[in-house]
Amino acid sequence: MSNLSPEAIKVRNALVEKGIETPMIDLVQDKDQRRQGIEQHMREVIKLIGLDLSDDSLEETPARLSKMFIDEIFSGLDYANFPKITNIENRMKVSEMVLVDDVTLTSTCEHHFVTIDGKVSVAYYPQKWVIGLSKINRVVAFFAQRPQVQERLTQQILLAFQTILETEDVAVYVKATHFCVKCRGIKDTNSYTVTSAFGGVFLDDRETRKEFLTLLKK
C-alpha cells in the first residue's frame, strides 16, 4: 500500500471497517502478468464458445479483453488508481448544499459481467472542507470501474465522500439500468433500479432530505 495516496488509504480502511468493501484478494502478480494470464484464459473461453480465433476480427480479442479488464472497466479494484484529491479549506464558509447531479455511471454487474448504465447524484453540506466538483465525478467513476452491485456501490460512494470531506452530511442517489435484466433473463428493456444512501442531516432531517430529492426532479 506504499504507493497509495493518504486519501485512498483512508477510504479503503473506512470501507473495510464498515464491511462494504468489494470482495477482493491481495494480488501478487503485476499488471503485465495479470494481462497475460487473462489473455490465455480468454483464448480458452472463446474457443469453448465456438469462435474461431484465427479470424482476423477475433485474433486480438483475448488481448483486448485483458487490457480492458485491467486498465479500464475494472481499474477501480486497484487503489493506486484512486483519484488525486486536494481538500480545499472552506474559507468562504459555504453552508448551503452542494449538489452535483446526473453524473454518468457506467459499471459492470458482478453477477453476469454485463453493463450497468445510469446516473448518480451526490450532495453534501460543507463543514471544514470542500473539493473540486470534477473530483466528485472521478470518485464515482473509480467505484464504478469494478464489478458491482448497485446497493453496495451507493454505500461506497457515500462513505468515500464522508471520509474525504470529514462530514456525515452527504447524500447519494443512483438510478440505473441493468443489462443483466435488459439483455438476458426477463429481457425487460424499460425498468430501472433506484438506490439512495443518506448520512448526517440528510438522514436525520426529513425536510433536508426532501429538498435534495426535490432538486433531483428539476
UniProtKB/Swiss-Prot annotation:
Q: Which UniProt keywords apply?
A: GTP-binding, Hydrolase, Metal-binding, Nucleotide-binding, One-carbon metabolism, Zinc
Q: Which EC number applies? A: 3.5.4.16
Cross-referenced NCBIfam families, in alphabetical order?
Answer: folE (TIGR00063), PRK09347.1-1 (NF006824), PRK09347.1-3 (NF006826)
Q: Give the organism, scientific name.
A: Histophilus somni (strain 2336)
Where does it sit, as one GO cellular component term? cytoplasm
Q: Which family does it belong to?
A: Belongs to the GTP cyclohydrolase I family.
Lineage from the top down?
Answer: Bacteria, Pseudomonadati, Pseudomonadota, Gammaproteobacteria, Pasteurellales
Binding positions (Zn(2+)): 109, 112, 180
- Kindly report, in one word, the top-level EC class recorded for this enzyme: hydrolase
UniProt xrefs under PANTHER family? GTP CYCLOHYDROLASE 1, GTP CYCLOHYDROLASE I
Cite the record's note on assembly: Homomer.
Provide any one GO MF term from the record.
GTP binding
Gene3D superfamilies per record: 1.10.286.10, 3.30.1130.10
Tell me one GO biological process term.
one-carbon metabolic process
- This protein's record includes keyword Chloroplast: no
Query: A Pfam family name for this chain?
Result: GTP_cyclohydroI
Q: Which domain of life is it from?
A: Bacteria
Q: Catalytic activity, per the record?
A: GTP + H2O = 7,8-dihydroneopterin 3'-triphosphate + formate + H(+)
What's this protein's name? GTP cyclohydrolase 1
Write out the pathway annotation from the protein's UniProt entry: Cofactor biosynthesis; 7,8-dihydroneopterin triphosphate biosynthesis; 7,8-dihydroneopterin triphosphate from GTP: step 1/1
